[in-house]
Every structure is written in structure tokens, then in C-alpha cells.
């Protein structure tokens, strides 16, 4: 089911990038742009994980963030759940 949603979602992002984004002007603080990042994340990790990564990216795309080069990660486990935040079952 997720693959059935993936292609139309990427198509919607392409339409946004081509038709709506030029009207709004360049506002993204990152390279690649947030829409390109979303397309790459969805294509690489599937619909749900891709949307999660894209939402996290959009939350970072704001004036208090310096921006810069921020590609889609190669490995989602290190991006979404870093070792310092994983539950090991040992509590102090």
C-alpha cells in the first residue's frame, strides 16, 4: 500500500516544486531544498519514513537554523534514533 502512495506523493512534490515554489521565491535554508529532500527521502526510505524525515527537515527550515548542506541520510537508523537516545533497558 505504501508504494501505491509513494509515486503520487512524489508527483505532488514535483508539481509543487515546478508551479508553486517559483511563486513563493527561494526561502529554503538548505541544500537540497526541502521539496527535493522530501522526494529523495520518500524514494529512498518509503512513504512513512520519508514523510517523517521530510517533516523533521521542515521543522528545521526556520530562521533560527543556519541551514547549509543537509542531504538525505544514507542510513535512517542513525538519523531517526541516534545511539544516545535508544532504550537499552538499563536505567539508573
Curated annotation (Swiss-Prot):
Q: Which domain of life is it from?
A: Bacteria
Q: Which UniProt keywords apply?
A: Cell inner membrane, Cell membrane, Membrane
Pfam families documented for this protein: YidD (PF01809)
In the UniProt record, does the keyword Cell membrane occur? yes
- GO cellular component, as recorded: plasma membrane
Tell me what topology the record assigns in the membrane. Answer: Peripheral membrane protein
Does the UniProt entry include the keyword Endoplasmic reticulum? no
The compartments listed are: Cell inner membrane
Q: Where is this region: Disordered?
A: 69-92
Residue ranges crossing the lipid bilayer per the database entry: none
Taking the first listed entry, what is the main subcellular location of this protein, grouped into a coarse class?
membrane
NCBIfam families noted in UniProt: membrane protein insertion efficiency factor YidD
- Family classification: Belongs to the UPF0161 family.
Summarize the protein's role. Answer: Could be involved in insertion of integral membrane proteins into the membrane.
Q: What is this protein called?
A: Putative membrane protein insertion efficiency factor
Which species does this protein come from? Xylella fastidiosa (strain 9a5c)
